[in-house]
Amino acid sequence: MKLIEPRNLKGFRDYLPKDQIPRSIIFSKIKGVFERFGFEPLETPVLEYADILAGKYGVEGEKLMYRFKDNGERDVAMRYDLTVPLARVAAQYQNELPKPFKRYQIAPVWRAENTQKGRYREFYQCDVDVVGSAVGIADAECVAMVEEIFFELGIKKFVIKINNRKILNAIMLTAGVSEEKILDAIRAVDKLEKVGPKEVASELKEKAGLNSKQAEQLITLASTKISDINALKTFVEENILKQPQAEQGFEELNSVFVALKAFGVKNALIDLSLARGLDYYTSTIFETIITETEDSKKYGSVAGGGRYDQLIKLFTGKDIPAVGISIGIDRLFAAMQDLGLIQNKGIVSVLILNLEESLQKEYLKMLSALRKAGINAELFYSLADIKKQFAFAESKSIPYGVLLGLDEAKKQAVTLRNLETRKQKTIKQKSLLKELQKLLK
């Protein structure tokens, strides 16, 4: 018989317990903050009709979609993000959902992109969105929530960059970009931090039809450092006020920052070069970068999103405002590993060692009592060398071991061992539960 080589597709991976346990802890903390902010869970299918997803992500995003014909010759695609499926849900169930509708979803998405550290073709997103609320508090709440999540995960240094697509559009028009080329110019500017001004200028000339002077002006305007909302007002008045969207963009961003100040958010700043490459953004956009690492570009954006007031209209024919933000858990996890924030923690608290054949019933009774008391416990299934059983406990990061041999059984006692410090003490069997509950608080 020819053996099948066990292997993964490029960009896809397994999560063994040593990785999945801390990931689950991170998911749980994120979910806790989501629910604290009033967001409710939603699940959507992996597969959607291709026309639901197509045309929402721009030319480059379209190339990354996993799209194929299923067994019924239907044109289908695997979800590229969680936002467009939400837009479909908001339209499909618009008469059943509360208004505004605040939802979160934690699920994998698929993109056929180049792989690198922290970037995969299958990866999880943690999304929150508010459907049915105009620009202002809802946008600020998304930002405040991300800040709280990062603090809760132990990340101290990060920035949440914020911009407004209307202001960015006004910059584009001021520099000479035509209306029909704005999205092409936005996709170019979106790469400014990754590839630098020279490459962006080249793409602006090639894709957006600008000459060298116009490209330079656009990059200069978009690279202007804005210290606060008052500085933004001055920038708008001095540079782009002639464009019809400029004033509205400023007023929208101002309303967001008024709410952010009330929320007490400290890590948000205005970045006029922030573009976000997806086509459906219409107003506020955000992006979060971890700055604790030596190279803040290493993982790219670990959280990003924005307002998409016209996306749901594609399904309903009417404007329904919406805003959301997504956390890329794989990039976040990779960064947290480098920062030493991932604890090697198991889910089992106690291992009962298997030392005597004649004591099997006692082991099982003890195991059952611990579990019924809410303690995660397991028994080493077979008789084995004690060193082997300790090694098993260490491999699973189990903190405590319970030893019951013939001598302890005669005295109705057990030995409770701290498997990390190797300190142990003998206690009465009836005291074991109370002792463990005290240690595991």
Regions found by a protein language model. Give the residues of each.
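Auxiliary tRNA-acceptor-end handling modules of aminoacyl-tRNA synthetases
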Residues: M1-Q20, S178
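Hydrophobic mid-domain F-helix/FG-region of cytochrome P450s
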Residues: M145-E152, K166-T174
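Acidic, His- and aromatic-enriched active-site or binding-groove loops in soluble protein domains
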Residues: K63-G72, V177-K198
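Polyanion/phosphate-binding surface patch
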Residues: L42, V46-V76
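Short, conserved phosphate-binding/catalytic loop or strand-edge motifs used
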Residues: Y120-C126, I162-A170
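Positively charged, Gly/Ser-enriched RNA/tRNA-binding surfaces
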Residues: P22-F37, E48-Y49, G72, T83-Q94, ...
